[in-house]
Amino acid sequence: MAAGAEHGLKRIVWQRIKDTLIADCRKSEVWKILILDQFTTRLLSSCCKMSNLMSEGITIVEDLHKNREPVPEMKAIYFMRPTAMCVDAFINDFKLKPKYKAAYVFFTDYCPDDLFDKMKKNCAKHIKVCKEINVSFLPLEAQVFTCENTEAFKSIYTPNSQDRDQTLETIANQIVTLCATLDDQPALTHFTLFSFHIQGKTQAQLLIVDRALDPVSPILHELTYQAMAYDLIPIKDNNYEYKLNDGSKKEALLNEEDELWVKLRHMHIAEVTGQIPKLVKEISANRDEKKQADGKITIGGLSQLMKKMPGFRKQMTQKTVHVSLAEDLMSHFQKNVEKLCKAEQDLAVGADAEGQKVKDPMRTLLPVLLHPHDTTDKIRAVLLYIFSLNGTTAENLNKLIQHVKIEDESGYILNWKHLGVPILSTVSLMLSFRKQPRKDRSDKETYNVSRWTPVIKDIMEDAVENKLEVKDWPYQSECPSAWNGSRAVSARQKHKGSSPDDLRSGSRLILFVLGGVSYSEMRCAYEVTHANKSCEVIIGSTHILTPRGLLEDIYKLDK
């Protein structure tokens, strides 16, 4: 497995799958078929390669929901979610004429009794093993996981949602499987909208925060490499399309298999561009060496070249990809984003680069509105203006909506109220919404266009240092002694109304963001871990946010 995936959550999940799903089937020496649903396909893809499966005796991987040729002489491993659709598909494989010699069934988490009884009734004699392995989340990065539930946002925040409680219960169960996988063993005893009760002996502290805690971070133009890429470039399923010198197009996968990506992803774009001349020089030097070698190659030289060629070629490809991506990002930055960033930072921080308080946020916003920026960028700036004031007047709000020309799409702004974020500065909302107190970071060196620090970083640091305020963070259960007397913490702040080289053997902070997590917040988990060697921070959410994706989610809340 790759450098970035050899550690952290991905390695732990792959080890758990080997120790349960594969170990149970290893007693038989014959080769087996692995059958997956959509979720488990993504799960396995995130933590292993086909070569890893082959080495464990699995020769074929197939889709549970597609037509498959029977292979009656082979045994099949079914790895799937405990849903009616998956169970029905499994039963159909054995109901009439069995497709396989036997079935080893593994569910990602708890299988309801009615589904279990249905399987037992229809094909019990074909089932050799039936287990729940408690891995119902995706390990996206060494310290990042998701519940792979983009629909959760709508279910939780839509007014009068019919499936809010069911969605929250599902998320709670998924968090429990994470804790089980990490061997932190908290037991879920109670889950309400914004509290999470855990108990049991554990080395972890668990915090759950609501998206409304920090509406600013996912809206700002973030200028670190990974966050900037997913904001400005159309990257789908982590695939980045770039052009070669001959005009042809190629795709590159931006994940932890790419060591250069792991190295660069949390750097500021100014630092990344500082690396580009070196990368270009190395690529050019490689081409020159290749030309020289083509002219005077010996058998011994050819042998040496062949030995290092795969790794060498991979390194050169990675460098080419990141030269292209960095240039793409700088092109966007210089064309549009640079003009926005100063205004955005002043509105978010509440002060300018010299530390002078912004007395009239409208004067900061106005140049953005008058410039021919993209409508989405103007919406983002308007939101930052409103957030800075903790809501604005109805008259002012209507003027802003008209100025941005979104009278028929005002939900991009108005629907933030469904998250509990003040948009109109009514007395009741002002009393019910209290902003999280911020740490003073004025002594830290920052770029003028990157002065904002996500609220979550403050919370992570306070949790690690045992400084969370009891009045804001009601404790739910006893925390491990490793936290020096602190206790495991429940969740949302209660207002009224780069990958590490190894896993820490000490404490672990798990922070879950209900309603999506931004790339800038993901970066904070790595930074706090790096700064506190005795504690590893893992961050997770229902799904990963991009600014445009979040705005679309907000807009659809009243549809």
Where are the regions a protein language model picked out?
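Extended, well-folded catalytic/binding cores that form a central cleft or groove in large enzyme
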Residues: M1-K559
